[in-house]
Amino acid sequence: MGKARKHSRGRPSGFVPDYMQAVEPDEFVYSERMNSEASPPLKRRRFGLNGDNNGVSKEVLSLSKMSRSERKNLVHKLKMELQQVRDLSKKIASFSSDTVLLSPYNDHSCSDGPRRPPPENFATFVGSQGKKRPPVRSDKQRNKKGPSRLNVPTSYTVASVMKECETLLNRLWSHKSGWPFRTPVDPVMLNIPDYFNVIKHPMDLGTIRSRLCKGEYSSPLDFAADVRLTFSNSIAYNPPGNQFHTMAQGISKYFESGWKSIEKKIPMSKPPVIPLTSSASLESEIPFEVAPMRKKEAAMNDNKLRVEPAKLVMTDGEKKKLGQDLMALEEDFPQKIADLLREQSGSDGQSGEGEIEIDIEALSDEILFMVRKLLDDYLREKKKSMEKSEPCEMEIVHDSGFSNSPLQPSKGDLQIDEDVDIVGGNDPSVSSHPPLKIEKDAACRNNESSSSSSSSSESGSSSSDSDSCSSSGSETDSIKASKPTSREEKKQPGVGIDKKEDDSNSEKIVVNDSLNELDQLEHTVGEKSTTMDAVVLVPDEETAPPERQISPDSPDKRYRAAFLKNRFADTIMKAREKAFTKGEKGDPEKLRIEREEFEKRLREEKERLQAEAKAAEEARRKAKAEAAEKARREREQEREAARQALQKMEKTVEINEGIRFMEDLQMLRATGTEGDQLPTSMEVMSPKFSEDMLGLGSFKMESNSNPLEHLGLYMKMDEDEDEEEDPPHFSQRKVEDNPFDRSEKQEHSPHRVEGEDQLVSGNEEPVSQEAHDNGDQEDGKPINPNEIERQLENMPEQESGVGDKEEQETEVVDMRKQENEVVDMGVEEVHPLDRSEGRTLSPHRKEREDPRASGNEESVSEKAQDYENQRDEKINQSEREEQLENVLEQESSRDDDTGEQETEVVGVGKELSLDKSEGQTLSPHREEGENQLDCGNEELVSQKTQDNGNQEDEKSINKIEGEEQLANVPEQESRVTEKEEQETGVVDLGEQKSEVVEKGVEENEAVDNGEGVQGTEVSDKGGNETVVDGNGKVETEVVDKAGQKTDLVDQGEEDIDVEID
């Protein structure tokens, strides 16, 4: 018992026990040191795990100065470090079965003092600040202190094994497929942003070499695990058929072949594994009293140092996934897993039907991995049972070769994803074919399951395999794909799908085309592949979408069938050709003939199918063109109908726009007084205004009322005005704009009275005013009928005399060059004629004058106006005044017979001025009306012939000549408008104007030679004619007049000379 007792606690570095009650409240100092020289009687020494060869770390704790909260935190920290120490101890124990590693917590002490606590209850602290120094890796401790602290002959064996690992790594580095794995994967450069989402623990050969050179690997097994992790990451991320996937598989096989020789050299011992308890029971291992700890240490001193193998640590994500899988199996929970969890929770005595509450965080990693394995086995068995009754549904993804679609990384015990490949280069695409059903053999499924299970168990030590195990529970319903293989592994060609797993199991699926045109080819292919284990592929018409179930008579169905025939024909023909080359060996000549026939048949079949496809395409194109043409025609018809409807609508709108007119009238009616209506200006101008307005429905217009009075407008009637003014209704300029229209109406109208009442109504009032201004000669002196008859008897003599005088006027007018100017201004001629006619047609004079007298006055006034125009052009104002004064003297000297003479002169003037044709066309009824203005000269001539007998023939000739002279009078009358001021002066003189009218044609001839004297002679002639008429001496006076006319002609020649000068 005198020997020093050995203590094997099996705790790794970093463990800090709870020593709050094991030490005294006084200050203490401890240190741990590893003895460099191994001696049989090991003594208690002080050493630290965090110490090195150059110094010793110390920590001074004063328990008396610690508060209760600080002590509680210290206990919690030590419990966490305890688990870390245990994990490190298991890694150290995995070096060799013959190696005995001394625990750093040897119960060695420098003194036997009772106050000294055991070294295993102490923790390692550095610095006075109370911060924990990170633990040193176990491999460094082994390299630096292993030879000095261990006197074991197997230590050199571990070093030699690591040397061989380095040699194997160099061989992998120089391998032809090893270049992609030399450096870490760069997701940015390779454009694979999801790399770290799939690969949780990346690794590469460059990192492994760096760790190996630094001595960070504590065991060759860690080295092998990192190498396997490098290749498994590449296989998991890259889909089958990818270049890097294939390279990873090849170099992984190369590594496994070299690792077998190294693995045999590693001394391994598998001590009995004691299941670890949950972390909830760790508190019981921490001594709260010194006595129980010493009893435990005494019990362990008799046993050899126990070494536990290293294990992997389950990450938080894996724990979470495991918990989700367990919750998913709540209804059908496996009994084995329930028993294991019941043992760990300490509820062994409970019945199996009770609920189990488990905290996954409280369980150890070893228990969690055991639960994970049991769960995977259960899910695998469940999947096998479901596969026996359910077929898997899959789609043909690509035409040929391997699939380039992204596949899920291979995970653990889950079956590796498989890809279906149809041999040939012209396979239909995904959108061209419905899903297909494949029923697999049970034996094949068993082989796949066993293969995947073995692969999962083989790589169970890697982190990638453990990570993939957590996702196997979610894929239990159906198989989505099958394992793809390279073309080199397809040793049995044919029409079908080849699937190989682990180079042993294969499955061949023959394509059975349902098209009628390829039945013969399918029979041939079926005969060639009778030795295959075939499963027919049938289109799933029941599960196909509705759009794919097309009626057999539709053009789309025929085009679809032709297209599929063409596609499947190429695939099956190529497969058949391959099968033909693999046929039985026979006569070469026979084979050659069969090959030629087969190729010929293939070409014919292909041409036929292509022709059918082309015909179907052409028919489809024609149908499409016809449909487009039909749609175009319908569209044109719709547009035409819309256009017609628009036209009808527009026409309706035009008709309805008349409502606005009535609305406007209603508004005007509302704004006026009671019973007042507001007509428009157009209605006021209309002659039928009253009649139209009487038919406007509710508008009751008074027929005898002026519409302007409803607007408050009244016309002022100034009858007492002395001067002639423009008519109130029509301006003088408007009348002058249409001069010839009025004269034409006078000539051609049979009812002159009615026409003049409408057209020259404005002139009646001025003429009436002139009549009033002329004094008693016109208004105050009634005409005696006897005098009128006497004057008519004297008219033939006067006409003959005047006719001779008119010859002189014709010569004077024709000799004047100024007549051209007068013609240009002929537009203004109508006004004086209208004025004279208005005066003669005035209602005031109709009551007092005979129609013949009024007619004579009109013609004489026209000639007077011509005379005024000529006189204004030849003489100045002073000469005109002298002549007018002479006329006034003669008028004043006249006696009561002046009225009679005026009547006679007016009658003569009328006969000379009025056009006989005008008189004939105007009115044939001279005797019936005094208001008719067209008293024709024919009636006057007829009366003269009755009275005068044979004198009528001679005078009629003179009248014709007078008419020719009067035809030129309008040219002279046009000058009246240029001298409106002079005319106004003549009209104002009253009596002077009447005297001028009496002068007749003679005043026109006397331009510059004493026209006043000639006027006196004319007046004397009037008196002489009256006397001759009374005495019957007519012929004598006519002869005298002829002589006087000769004198007047001479005077006219003098006038021509004056005008030329």
UniProtKB/Swiss-Prot annotation:
GO CC entries: nucleus
Coiled-coil features, chain-numbered ranges: 588-658, 852-893
SUPFAM superfamilies found in the cross-reference section: Bromodomain
Chain intervals with Low complexity compositional bias: 448-476
Domain NET, residue spans: 304-386
SMART domains from the UniProt entry: BROMO
Compositionally skewed regions (Polar residues) per UniProt: 940-949
Superkingdom of this protein's organism: Eukaryota
Location of this chain's protein in the cell: Nucleus
Domain Bromo: 156-262
Region feature (Disordered): 32-56, 106-152, 443-518, 538-558, 606-645, 710-1033
UniProt entry keywords in alphabetical sequence: Abscisic acid signaling pathway, Bromodomain, Coiled coil, Nucleus, Repressor, Transcription, Transcription regulation
Pfam family name, one: Bromodomain
Regulation: induction: Up-regulated by potassium deprivation, by salt stress, cold and treatment with exogenous abscisic acid (ABA).
Subunit structure: Interacts with TIP/NAC091.
Name assigned to this protein: Transcription factor GTE10
Organism of derivation: Arabidopsis thaliana (Mouse-ear cress)
Name of the gene encoding the protein in the UniProt record: GTE10
